[in-house]
């Protein structure tokens, strides 16, 4: 209502905010003729939600910003032009965009070596916008700022045109039977089911596989989806080793004040009795 009444022209929302906005029962009672630009970011957005959002706001240009507070805060932009129909649209919409003019972005391995196009490593950035350090936290500063680069903690890769693709938070990656499973990919598959409102995929201890893929799912109102049906749905969209081995349904998922999923809250009960948070 405030966006309509105040004639908001630009806004920045995290995906959870967009989802709750367009799914609100009274959303269609309002119009936003002056809303020229909607930027989104701070958390991954699945393809289904992005398509629904662009349909819900047909006269609005969309753009994605990628970065972190330590980078003041944006280092990559997926421009409005990248959201327009074209031969590369589907691929580009999976990316976080290309680096802004004052930032240099690269993909590095754990030893700080730059990786070739298409290979997954850690997203790092440098430039005049990088922080000097964390206040009175020299150890954390030394860990984040190494060899002149700010280490984001995000795993990703870069294509030949310089578009950066975020695959997961490095700490959220699941290693099951020696295979790397990126939780975002599983969440995107789950999001394709019409009964799902929101999901979080985490790794939980497993005696056989080390870790197994576990999905925590929030359903839409009046939905009756069960575990077996959702697992079979995932089997259509992703490889067998990425499919959730267990599904837990909840009425709400833990979110930060900024609307980000707090996966550490979901993981804690499963790992509390373990000596290490990897298995």
How would you label these PLM feature ranges?
Residues 104-110, 251-258:
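Active-site and channel-lining beta-strand-loop segments
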Residues 63-70, 97, 202-204, 248:
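Beta-strand->loop->alpha-helix junctions that form or flank phosphate-binding loops
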Residues 42, 67, 97, 154, ...:
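Active-site glycine-centered loops adjacent to acidic/histidine catalytic or metal-binding residues
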């Amino acid at each position: 209502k405030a966006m309509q009444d105040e004639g908001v022209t630009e806004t920045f929302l995290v995906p959870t905010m967009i989802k709750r906005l367009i799914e609100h029962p009274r959303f269609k009672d309002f119009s936003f003729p002056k809303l020229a630009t909607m930027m989104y970011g701070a958390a991954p957005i699945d393809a289904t939600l992005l398509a629904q959002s662009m349909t819900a706001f047909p006269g609005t240009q969309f753009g994605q910003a990628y970065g972190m507070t330590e980078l003041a805060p944006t280092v990559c932009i997926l421009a409005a032009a990248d959201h327009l129909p074209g031969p590369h649209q589907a691929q580009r919409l999976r990316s976080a965009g290309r680096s802004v003019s004052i930032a240099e972005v690269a993909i590095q391995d754990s030893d700080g070596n730059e990786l070739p196009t298409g290979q997954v490593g850690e997203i790092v950035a440098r430039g005049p916008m990088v922080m000097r350090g964390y206040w009175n936290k020299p150890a954390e500063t030394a860990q984040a700022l190494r060899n002149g680069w700010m280490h984001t903690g995000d795993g990703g890769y870069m294509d030949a045109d310089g578009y950066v693709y975020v695959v997961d938070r490095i700490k959220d990656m699941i290693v099951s039977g020696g295979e790397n499973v990126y939780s975002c990919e599983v969440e995107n598959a789950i999001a394709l089911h019409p009964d799902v409102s929101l999901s979080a995929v985490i790794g939980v201890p497993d005696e056989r596989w080390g870790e197994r893929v576990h999905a925590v799912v929030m359903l839409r109102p009046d939905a009756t989806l069960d575990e077996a049906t959702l697992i079979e749905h995932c089997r259509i969209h992703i490889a067998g080793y990425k499919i959730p081995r267990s599904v837990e349904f909840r009425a709400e998922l833990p979110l930060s004040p900024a609307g980000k999923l707090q996966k550490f809250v979901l993981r804690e009960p499963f790992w509390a009795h373990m000596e290490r948070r990897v298995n």
